[in-house]
Amino acid sequence: MTKEMQTLALVPQGSLEAYIRAANAYPMLTAEEERELAERLHYQGDLDAAKQLILSHLRFVAHIARNYSGYGLPQADLIQEGNIGLMKAVRRFNPEVGVRLVSFAVHWIKAEIHEYVLRNWRIVKVATTKAQRKLFFNLRKTKQRLGWFNQDEVELVARELGVTSKDVREMESRMAAQDMTFDPTPDDEARDGQSMAPVLYLQDKSSDFAEGIEEDNWESNAADKLAYALEGLDERSQHIIRARWLDDDNKSTLQELADQYGVSAERVRQLEKNAMKKLKMAIEA
């Protein structure tokens, strides 16, 4: 697939509202039109046919991505990841199977979004507000010396960092939460059927996955490992992670960072993905 088509399909440019309006403006295909385009791609390698198939299904990706709101992840990034899944589905779609592309593509779209959420939610939910980010980068040093805080220590830390006692307690709890596997485990099934596996939460708007993790409150040193791993990244990767997830409330978009570094948005996405992979490996080590 051409670079131009990848840019158009993968990276929502400008405002999200404008992107969604543009996606909805592309006409939906009839079954006959879809099959003709799919045959041109499948048998002739027609990239223009692939482009038309992708553009006509962008609205579907945006609709699916909305079901994964509530994780502190940018909606544009969720759509971008879903679009990657759509492109994979289009590349693998066989018109002779006898199903519509939308039915075939839904698995690929959701799989990419699932992977993205699970790769990033932990880092986002540890520090989602400015006060929590301040705590995240300072609290671990105090905890290494004192361990779990009593109430007097909580109040002391709160005064020193200029936050509330509630903020300190919440961050202490978040820093103790450990990561989860995607699918239910035998241990989950043994706990009165109350599984915390993300596969049961990701697309359920009535459930707050992060809140469930915090309530379960499994102790872990994941936050310490994350902070140390951040220090081990190169300067550009550190800046990308902080600008995208950990800095001020106005998080940078892929395009903004691309303009800053003089590279493509796709290149920034690759750097971000590699940095996230290193952080995840450090957390799981």
Swiss-Prot record:
<comment type="function">
    <text>Sigma factors are initiation factors that promote the attachment of RNA polymerase to specific initiation sites and are then released. This sigma factor is involved in regulation of expression of heat shock genes.</text>
</comment>
<feature type="region of interest" description="Sigma-70 factor domain-2">
    <location>
        <begin position="53"/>
        <end position="122"/>
    </location>
</feature>
<dbReference type="GO" id="GO:0003677">
    <property type="term" value="F:DNA binding"/>
</dbReference>
<protein>
    <recommendedName>
        <fullName>RNA polymerase sigma factor RpoH</fullName>
    </recommendedName>
</protein>
<keyword id="KW-0238">DNA-binding</keyword>
<dbReference type="Pfam" id="PF04542">
    <property type="entry name" value="Sigma70_r2"/>
</dbReference>
<keyword id="KW-0805">Transcription regulation</keyword>
<dbReference type="InterPro" id="IPR007630">
    <property type="entry name" value="RNA_pol_sigma70_r4"/>
</dbReference>
<keyword id="KW-0346">Stress response</keyword>
<keyword id="KW-0963">Cytoplasm</keyword>
<dbReference type="Pfam" id="PF00140">
    <property type="entry name" value="Sigma70_r1_2"/>
</dbReference>
<feature type="region of interest" description="Sigma-70 factor domain-4">
    <location>
        <begin position="229"/>
        <end position="281"/>
    </location>
</feature>
<dbReference type="InterPro" id="IPR000943">
    <property type="entry name" value="RNA_pol_sigma70"/>
</dbReference>
<dbReference type="GO" id="GO:0005737">
    <property type="term" value="C:cytoplasm"/>
</dbReference>
<keyword id="KW-0804">Transcription</keyword>
<feature type="DNA-binding region" description="H-T-H motif">
    <location>
        <begin position="254"/>
        <end position="273"/>
    </location>
</feature>
<keyword id="KW-0731">Sigma factor</keyword>
<dbReference type="InterPro" id="IPR036388">
    <property type="entry name" value="WH-like_DNA-bd_sf"/>
</dbReference>
<dbReference type="InterPro" id="IPR013324">
    <property type="entry name" value="RNA_pol_sigma_r3/r4-like"/>
</dbReference>
<dbReference type="InterPro" id="IPR009042">
    <property type="entry name" value="RNA_pol_sigma70_r1_2"/>
</dbReference>
<dbReference type="GO" id="GO:0006352">
    <property type="term" value="P:DNA-templated transcription initiation"/>
</dbReference>
<feature type="short sequence motif" description="Interaction with polymerase core subunit RpoC">
    <location>
        <begin position="77"/>
        <end position="80"/>
    </location>
</feature>
<dbReference type="InterPro" id="IPR050813">
    <property type="entry name" value="Sigma-70_Factor"/>
</dbReference>
<dbReference type="InterPro" id="IPR013325">
    <property type="entry name" value="RNA_pol_sigma_r2"/>
</dbReference>
<dbReference type="InterPro" id="IPR007627">
    <property type="entry name" value="RNA_pol_sigma70_r2"/>
</dbReference>
<dbReference type="InterPro" id="IPR014284">
    <property type="entry name" value="RNA_pol_sigma-70_dom"/>
</dbReference>
<comment type="subunit">
    <text>Interacts with the RNA polymerase core enzyme.</text>
</comment>
<dbReference type="GO" id="GO:0016987">
    <property type="term" value="F:sigma factor activity"/>
</dbReference>
<dbReference type="InterPro" id="IPR012759">
    <property type="entry name" value="RNA_pol_sigma_RpoH_proteobac"/>
</dbReference>
<comment type="similarity">
    <text>Belongs to the sigma-70 factor family. RpoH subfamily.</text>
</comment>
<dbReference type="Pfam" id="PF04545">
    <property type="entry name" value="Sigma70_r4"/>
</dbReference>
<dbReference type="GO" id="GO:0009408">
    <property type="term" value="P:response to heat"/>
</dbReference>
